[in-house]
């Protein structure tokens, strides 16, 4: 008889699809028009650091260079148990893995003024680390205030309905 052919428990499924890092500020500063889930090319020590939750997406952005999607300014801390020789540069440019048609579609959108690609989160999908990137349009201060006001009104409405 084979081993492990049964169903996974709920805890095992949750661990296999775990959020590793989230860029909450991006949803405040940008209006997200479209999202795309991509793979990411990491070194061994980077994988260990990301799984330990040592990644910061706050200043990150994506560029398309030579037909490839690259992730810039994402800080992944050096692994604590690796020697200095084997460790990675925390701010190195990392390649994102997406299909050609997806990259071409994003390139077409980026030619419009004011749009940018930003990393929204890093998460596990099975044993693979994935990056969700978003096509965003920068918000002005009055847009941020309006969005916060709408959010507050929705919350108050939801709370009022829950009370009665």
From Swiss-Prot:
It holds the Pfam family SmpB. One of its GO terms (cellular component) is cytosol. Its main location: cytoplasm. GO terms for biological process: trans-translation. SUPFAM superfamilies: Small protein B (SmpB) (SSF74982). One of its GO terms (molecular function) is RNA binding. It is found in: Cytoplasm. It comes from the Bacteria. InterPro entries: SmpB, SsrA-bd_prot, SsrA-bd_prot_CS. Keywords: Cytoplasm, RNA-binding. Required for rescue of stalled ribosomes mediated by trans-translation. Binds to transfer-messenger RNA (tmRNA), required for stable association of tmRNA with ribosomes. tmRNA and SmpB together mimic tRNA shape, replacing the anticodon stem-loop with SmpB. tmRNA is encoded by the ssrA gene; the 2 termini fold to resemble tRNA(Ala) and it encodes a 'tag peptide', a short internal open reading frame. During trans-translation Ala-aminoacylated tmRNA acts like a tRNA, entering the A-site of stalled ribosomes, displacing the stalled mRNA. Belongs to the SmpB family. This is SsrA-binding protein. It comes from Synechococcus sp. (strain CC9311).
């Amino acid at each position: 008889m084979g081993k492990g052919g049964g169903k996974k428990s709920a805890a095992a499924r949750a661990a296999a699809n775990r959020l590793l890092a989230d860029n909450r500020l991006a949803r405040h500063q940008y209006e997200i028009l479209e999202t795309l889930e991509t793979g990411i090319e990491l070194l061994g020590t980077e994988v260990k650091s990301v799984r330990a939750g040592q990644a910061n997406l706050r200043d990150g952005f994506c560029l398309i260079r030579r037909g490839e999607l690259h992730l810039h300014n994402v800080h992944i801390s050096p692994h604590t148990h690796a020697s200095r020789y084997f460790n990675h540069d925390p701010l190195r440019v990392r390649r994102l893995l997406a299909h050609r048609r997806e990259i071409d579609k994003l390139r077409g959108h980026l030619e419009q003024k004011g749009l940018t690609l930003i990393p929204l989160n890093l998460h596990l999908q099975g044993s693979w680390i994935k990056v969700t990137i978003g096509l965003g349009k920068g918000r002005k201060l009055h847009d941020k205030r309006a969005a916060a006001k709408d959010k507050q009104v929705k919350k108050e409405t939801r709370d009022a309905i829950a009370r009665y």
